[in-house]
């Protein structure tokens, strides 16, 4: 017996079966940055149409988490896909660098600003800390395979960007959108300063909980608003009853808030020994609770109405000669109290927001030290927490105290002093939503933007419709300054504010924000300096990031305004999408983006958020170190990001399995292109074997589908289609069929070259389809493909070699897709024969396909080549009427299959069992086909 191994075309490739991505990827990254891959892409796409994805800046604090990874990978997939679509798509990453979390980190190490370090030194430490965090995050982002201008990112703390933020504010002021007002903030009376949310901790505390009567100003008018039975209007004074655990805020009461759709009841309280009859207004759901709390047993309901029916009603302040209105708000609940909410806009966020809608005074009688100001009636000079008891006594004295008790609840405390804090209105700077039509302009612009998913539009519309004026000022140390001068007497801006702000911006551009804080007013104002106060407030960090469309898109070379796309998590409808929209319209009357895409949050397999305490955190660093960046990228791309994205070790393992299928397909393609030179060996379409031509046509049509999915940001659809093609049409059909021809046909013969031509076209396309998602693996494949080529797949365009193949003829496509189904039936029959010990491998089998006339005609077209398509040694077609009872029948077509074991010897080279094996002179162990392939001109194939 001869050894024919040397006559076979055995697959050969340097592309390993195992990816070893965790070890291989870092080496590839090293090369990418040594050879300036990003710069090469920019040169390759110079002059092409621009596509600008503007990066929403992550905060420069802490390690990246899985949500960061999702966000950056999605952006990278889009940028790479757009680059392949022949766009010049630069990606400039950014970081948000100012604000409280960084201050707190520096404070932990160096103490409060102004203590161990002066303010300038403290700011410098903040800058240094932010830079260390940026470096750490940048390393992780690059490890994900995200390509961008990492050496030149935008940082909101770069001097130029700090200066441009001041210029952005100047433009907003110039357009008339900024004004001064009041807003309640967390206030520590021990610190004597405002606290941010992060500086507040909650502890249990006992507070006096009081129910307070607020008499109605017009009794008859009030009763008329309730649907009461005729003649049953009750007797006694009418009051609306409020409930509060902060009696010290009663002097600042300026309204009572009800829920619009809630049912309210007019309740008759009957006279008792020590109390005359009276009527009270309460939420119907809380009547029983209130009566029980007040120890009232004799009462009945007189009438009902909705909260909206009581809007505008005037009430008497419980302590002062003052009338306050009834208003409506969304924050009213029936969880506790009376359903009638005491509203002091100077001492609560909800109170402030609802008060703004009604134009209600923001009254704050409390000074920095927590003491009532001198002009506060009755309680001037008293500390608010010591005033609770005198206020309760006064309410009792004037007959407006319904009930008082001690109430234990969670209450905000200062994280430094561990003492209770208050809400207190302080002067702040606002961007007005309505003064110059900003809200209307923003709502108009929202309609012009494409939102992915579509519900994003209604979500941001409702938020913009309901949002209050934007408070842009903060009393912080580390931030961009509100670089303005205010008249000490009138509180008006300096008349030359715009020119002064430009001068300040120039100083900041040179020396950073410290230039403003060091600036002596005389330097710019000269003799006028005494008349003006230099504002020391800093800008809300949402303003910093919200004006990056101005500071980055309009200022960085190679970018342009507006952006084509903003892409962030769905929480950014409230955050960056909205701050960017508001500033864009305030500055330029236009949204700074054409499209907005949002992704959901990551949750575990049970739908729970990632939490260290639960122990379900999936760290991207761990995934990359264990499985590799491409597995993480494949998971992100295959998830439907429009909702919550589920991730767990098991889900990532499934992604790794899917990756292996793609890798194995790629390896087969590369291994069978060994020795193939497209310049010499490529077969023209019309000369190709029909099956080869068909699969290339399928790939061409698939490319059109994939490009559409990429353009619509449907990456999970890209992955599904790619996996289906690799697993079904290639893996279990085409590649399975062609192995015999590929390995045994004459090396230089048309039968094999046709097959290699198909594999080459598919490989050239597949590597590009994969590149945006499995970037590392795509480049690994690219390096091993035949033919001269550029260094990187990322500088390329989608495969252009499909032009003549796209649009496979319907009849041809239908036949091969039908054959795919026929093979499934044949495989069932073969499997049954294996179980029955009739055959071992499929090449021991001879099959008969019993079909109706139409199908039989289609199958007979293949003639001798049908057996190759079915992977059997013989295949013949007969009438369905002659099918034996034990034949395996198809469910969806007129087909039955029977299997018999071949009686012929096996060819030692191709393993087919053929009649002539053992009869050929000089080659007694070969079939005629193999002899032709070894010694002749090679077999001919037309179909398969």
UniProtKB/Swiss-Prot annotation:
Pfam families: Anticodon_1, tRNA-synt_1, zf-FPG_IleRS. It comes from the Bacteria. A motif ('KMSKS' region) lies at residues 609-613. Zn(2+) binds at residues 907, 910, 927, 930. ATP binds at residue 612. CDD domains: Anticodon_Ia_Ile_BEm, IleRS_core. Binds 1 zinc ion per subunit. One of its GO terms (cellular component) is cytosol. GO terms for molecular function: aminoacyl-tRNA deacylase activity; ATP binding; isoleucine-tRNA ligase activity; tRNA binding; zinc ion binding. Keywords: Aminoacyl-tRNA synthetase, ATP-binding, Cytoplasm, Ligase, Metal-binding, Nucleotide-binding, Protein biosynthesis, Zinc. Its cofactor is Zn(2+). Catalyzes the attachment of isoleucine to tRNA(Ile). As IleRS can inadvertently accommodate and process structurally similar amino acids such as valine, to avoid such errors it has two additional distinct tRNA(Ile)-dependent editing activities. One activity is designated as 'pretransfer' editing and involves the hydrolysis of activated Val-AMP. The other activity is designated 'posttransfer' editing and involves deacylation of mischarged Val-tRNA(Ile). IleRS has two distinct active sites: one for aminoacylation and one for editing. The misactivated valine is translocated from the active site to the editing site, which sterically excludes the correctly activated isoleucine. The single editing site contains two valyl binding pockets, one specific for each substrate (Val-AMP or Val-tRNA(Ile)). Monomer. This is Isoleucine--tRNA ligase.
